[in-house]
Amino acid sequence: MNHLYEQLTALKLTGFRDALKKQLAQPGTYQELGFEERLSLLTAEELTCRENRKAERLIKHARFRLNAELSKLDYRNNRGLDRALIRSLSQGNWLTLKQNILLTGATGSGKTFLACALGHNACRQGYKVYYYRLKALMEQCYQGKRQRSTVLTLIYW
């Protein structure tokens, strides 16, 4: 069995390997399932693991300032957050339509938290995100303009 685990690891099927270990550790739970059903569970676990690893890689690359999630948004304070709008934004339609979001508000109103939460959500949907403060983005564009590489910088992200 160790040889099989080594092969699965070499093939980078670690989710499949771990799910197989789980199935073998709990034979009563999976014993009544047929071969195709068990194989389907193993491949589904591998796909889930890959999606999770991709999302974590995208989140790490985005360099978010905060580890924020939409589920942690505080609607109690008078911040003017519309639950229906946030729910709509969380579905990611604005991403598929290639629309932008501009967050404005007073200092401490939660703009950074909301931006990071929407970015995390987009990463979990498989989108590449990069978190920029406006000042840093403008400085990079200005430097790119001086070096005539602004377009390349923006296309990269």
Model feature map: region roles:
Residues 93-96, 122-124, 155-157:
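Conserved catalytic network of the ASCE P-loop NTPase/AAA+ motor domain
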Residues 100:
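Walker A (P-loop) ATP-phosphate-binding motif of ABC ATPase nucleotide-binding domains
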Residues 68-92, 96:
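N-terminal pre-Walker A segment at the start of P-loop NTPase domains
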